[in-house]
């Protein structure tokens, strides 16, 4: 593998498979939320955010008057299918945030991640996250890592609701605009080649993170590493 050393004002990071083991999400977070989808909707039915989630789920179903049990069944099915749909991600985020706050969940990281993030941040590189998981869940994840609360290292958090689909170049342009950085001065790190293609089309530099044991192993035309320790990011 090559050893990329991009110069960038901003390093934008994926989570699952990039900073954190996919298994930590699939075997811990997803089951934790799935078991609580129905109870959460029923117990927090007066919460404005839950009402918004239910309304958006009904819109996706094309059933404006769908009963709550129908909505819960749809959310559960989308969870089982790992659908990247906004109402599911928002509800999972609420449940996960409560789980992190209760000490029942931990934001797992690969061992090389926290030292690299601190090193890049100290060098003057701004950091941000772009994940299909909700912004609320992202913040909770990085606040409760074995390496401590890392949220102070990040300038921004983006999800499919705030930025758009991760395979759409427009999402990366939107993030660059929000953070007031030109795309050519930003680098995106992910384990999914289609996401890297989209970021590249938006003008970002890219690095494929292909870690042993993770499900994605196609770098495409992107420089690649197996660990953050194999690369450096120089402040532009």
Swiss-Prot record:
Pathway assigned in UniProt: Amino-acid biosynthesis; L-methionine biosynthesis via salvage pathway; L-methionine from S-methyl-5-thio-alpha-D-ribose 1-phosphate: step 3/6; Amino-acid biosynthesis; L-methionine biosynthesis via salvage pathway; L-methionine from S-methyl-5-thio-alpha-D-ribose 1-phosphate: step 4/6
CDD domains on file: HAD_EP
Keyword Magnesium assigned: yes
Keyword Transport: no
Superkingdom: Bacteria
Cofactor note: Binds 1 Mg(2+) ion per subunit.
Biological process annotations from GO: L-methionine salvage from methylthioadenosine
InterPro entries: Enolase-ppase_E1 (IPR023943), HAD-like_sf (IPR036412), HAD-SF_hydro_IA (IPR006439), HAD_sf (IPR023214)
Catalytic activity: 5-methylsulfanyl-2,3-dioxopentyl phosphate + H2O = 1,2-dihydroxy-5-(methylsulfanyl)pent-1-en-3-one + phosphate
Keywords for the protein's UniProt record, in alphabetical order: Amino-acid biosynthesis, Hydrolase, Magnesium, Metal-binding, Methionine biosynthesis
One Gene Ontology term of the molecular function aspect: 2-hydroxy-3-keto-5-methylthiopentenyl-1-phosphate phosphatase activity
Cofactor(s) listed in the protein's UniProt record: Mg(2+)
Pfam families: Hydrolase
SUPFAM superfamilies per record: HAD-like
Function, as annotated: Bifunctional enzyme that catalyzes the enolization of 2,3-diketo-5-methylthiopentyl-1-phosphate (DK-MTP-1-P) into the intermediate 2-hydroxy-3-keto-5-methylthiopentenyl-1-phosphate (HK-MTPenyl-1-P), which is then dephosphorylated to form the acireductone 1,2-dihydroxy-3-keto-5-methylthiopentene (DHK-MTPene).
Family membership noted in the UniProt record: Belongs to the HAD-like hydrolase superfamily. MasA/MtnC family.
Subunit relationships: Monomer.
HAMAP family linked to this entry: Salvage_MtnC
Designated name of the protein: Enolase-phosphatase E1
Source organism: Frankia alni (strain DSM 45986 / CECT 9034 / ACN14a)
């Amino acid at each position: 593998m090559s050893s990329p050393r991009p110069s960038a004002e901003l390093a934008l990071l994926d989570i699952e498979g990039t900073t954190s083991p996919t298994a930590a999400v699939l075997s811990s977070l997803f089951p934790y939320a799935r078991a609580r989808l129905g109870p959460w909707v029923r117990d927090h039915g007066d919460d404005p955010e839950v009402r918004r989630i239910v309304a958006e789920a009904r819109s996706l179903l094309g059933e404006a008057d769908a009963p709550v049990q129908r909505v819960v069944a749809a959310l559960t099915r989308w969870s089982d299918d790992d659908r990247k749909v906004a109402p599911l991600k928002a509800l999972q985020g609420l449940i996960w945030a409560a789980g992190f706050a209760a000490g029942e969940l931990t934001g797992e990281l690969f061992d090389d991640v926290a030292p690299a993030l601190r090193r890049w941040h100290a060098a003057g590189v701004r950091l941000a996250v772009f994940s299909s998981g909700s912004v609320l869940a992202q913040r909770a994840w990085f606040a409760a890592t074995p390496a401590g609360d890392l949220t102070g290292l990040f300038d921004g958090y983006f999800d499919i609701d705030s930025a758009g689909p991760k395979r759409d170049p427009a999402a990366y342009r939107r993030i660059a605009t929000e953070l007031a950085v030109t795309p050519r001065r930003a680098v995106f790190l992910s384990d999914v080649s289609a996401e890297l293609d989209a970021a590249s089309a938006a003008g970002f530099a890219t690095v494929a993170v292909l870690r042993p044991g993770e499900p994605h192993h196609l770098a495409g035309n992107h420089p690649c590493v197996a660990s953050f320790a194999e690369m450096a990011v120089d402040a532009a």
